[in-house]
UniProtKB/Swiss-Prot annotation:
Lineage summary: Bacteria, Pseudomonadati, Pseudomonadota, Gammaproteobacteria, Pseudomonadales
Swiss-Prot/TrEMBL catalytic activity: (R)-4'-phosphopantetheine + ATP + H(+) = 3'-dephospho-CoA + diphosphate
Binding site for ATP: T9, F10, H17, G88, L89, R90, E98, Y123, S124, Y125, I126, S127, S128, T129
GO molecular function, one term: pantetheine-phosphate adenylyltransferase activity
Keyword Transferase belongs to the record: yes
Record's protein name: Phosphopantetheine adenylyltransferase
Main location: cytoplasm
EC assignment: 2.7.7.3
Function: Reversibly transfers an adenylyl group from ATP to 4'-phosphopantetheine, yielding dephospho-CoA (dPCoA) and pyrophosphate.
Stored HAMAP family: PPAT_bact
Keywords tagged on the record: ATP-binding, Coenzyme A biosynthesis, Cytoplasm, Magnesium, Nucleotide-binding, Nucleotidyltransferase, Transferase
Pfam family, one: CTP_transf_like
Length: 159
């Protein structure tokens, strides 16, 4: 069974992330969205809320599972018996960091391959950071995120 992990902070999960998950679900038997705790990034949403939102966005995909994690990614991949890590590349600027990360993960878990997908053109400019900034300033985020995520962002910035 081909099991792929798609790791990230997903703060929040965007339509760009969803696009990659949909495509991965067609390529792999089982897709695990691994939501990283990432305390150093000081996420807007709690780990539990980010997991909940990712589950809502992907509930129509039977071979997709969403799990939170706070360990080393290579260790988590082994625990989940994954044979691949999936990363998205939006632009050339993402490549250098992702290349270093892939090489480090190869050293830590040589049995787990790193694979890259580029987003559909209509999502290539979307980032969680930009979505948070637009939401914080009261802008329209509906075109960038699932309705449940838009609701969560509006509620968060109302508080």
């Amino acid at each position: 069974m081909n099991r792929v992990i798609y790791p990230g902070t997903f703060d929040p999960i965007t339509k760009g992330h969803g696009d990659l998950v949909e495509r991965a679900a067609k390529l792999f038997d089982h897709v695990i969205i691994a939501v990283a705790a990432s305390p150093k990034k000081n996420p807007l949403f709690s780990l539990d809320k980010r997991v909940e939102l990712a589950r809502e966005v992907t509930r129509h995909l039977p071979n997709v599972e969403v799990l939170g994690f706070s360990s080393l990614l290579a260790q988590f991949a082994r625990e989940q018996k994954a044979n691949a890590l999936l990363r998205g590349l939006r632009a050339v600027s993402d490549f250098e960091y992702e290349f270093q990360l892939a090489n480090m993960n190869r050293q830590l878990a040589p049995e787990v391959e790193s694979l890259f997908l580029t987003p559909s053109e209509k999502y290539s400019y979307i980032s969680s950071t930009l979505v948070r900034e637009i939401a914080a300033l009261g802008g329209n985020i509906e075109q960038f995120v699932h309705p449940a995520v838009a609701d969560a962002l509006r509620e968060r910035f109302r508080a």
